[in-house]
Amino acid sequence: MINREQCGQFIDANTDNMVKDWKRLVEIETGSFDKEGLEEAADTLKAMFEGIGFRCDLIDTGAAGKTLTGILGREREGKPILFSGHYDTVFPKGTLADNPFRIENGRAYGPGVLDMKGGIIIAYYVIKALNSLGFTERPIKILFAGDEEIAHENSTTAETLVEEAKNCEFAFNMETGLPDGSLCVGRKGGITISAEVTGVEAHAGNSFETGRNAIEEMAYKICRLREITNLSEGITVSVGTIKG
């Protein structure tokens, strides 16, 4: 049984090191299309987790950032614990120059500091704390994606996550919690849908009745789609782009 007090003491004693590693990771710019930065971050994380006993693999995702998977204590008897997340950010290369990593009035700033390099560092130090206290009850697994901010387009990262999570006793996604500091125990999913509406061309003056206006039909469908939104159920539908 892990002693919570001892675990907390380990974290407190390593606060400075946590901030240093946090800073180091944030200062590697990892916009979802910055292949060079993503490669550096993936290699950095792989080395960090291998340094605390993990056996890691990097899964190529083509143009996007690689997916890092790893396991510690594969031979342990209990069902695994999984820590997951992503290391890509929404910030383009060069953002760091104007928004460097810094701590002001107890708050950290910088590209990806919250979403979600801070969460990865938390996972890393939680595992280090467990190692220091001799935790051997369960295997510990990690999965950190390099293409989350672009919804894993053209990659199998989502399928890899499902596979890695199978048979796990617990899974912790290291994204941020709620604004009041409380933990979030669920996230809603999302789906992207493309629809094409085709009209019938006709002269608006001479042959109005033979035509079918695709713009009007699309407007009608947008209104119907909006009716699906149900805020009390957490369901939202947003039409983002119209072309034609």
Where are these regions (language model features)?
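Predominant activation on well-ordered alpha-helical scaffold segments within soluble catalytic domains
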Residues: 23, 46, 121-128, 159-162, ...
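Acidic-enriched catalytic cores of C-N bond-cleaving enzymes acting on peptides and small amides
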Residues: 185, 207-243
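Fold-independent oxyanion-binding glycine-rich loops
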Residues: 85-87, 145-147, 172-177, 195-200, ...
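Glycine/serine-rich anion-binding loops at beta->alpha junctions
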Residues: 91, 107-121, 203
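Short glycine-enriched loops at secondary-structure junctions
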Residues: 87-90, 95-96, 177-178, 187-190, ...
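Buried hydrophobic positions in well-ordered alpha/beta secondary-structure cores of metabolic enzymes
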Residues: 29, 83-86, 123, 142, ...
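Acidic/His- and Gly-rich active-site-bordering loop/insert found
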Residues: 2-111, 132-135
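Acidic/histidine-rich catalytic neighborhood of metal-dependent amide-processing enzymes
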Residues: 116-188
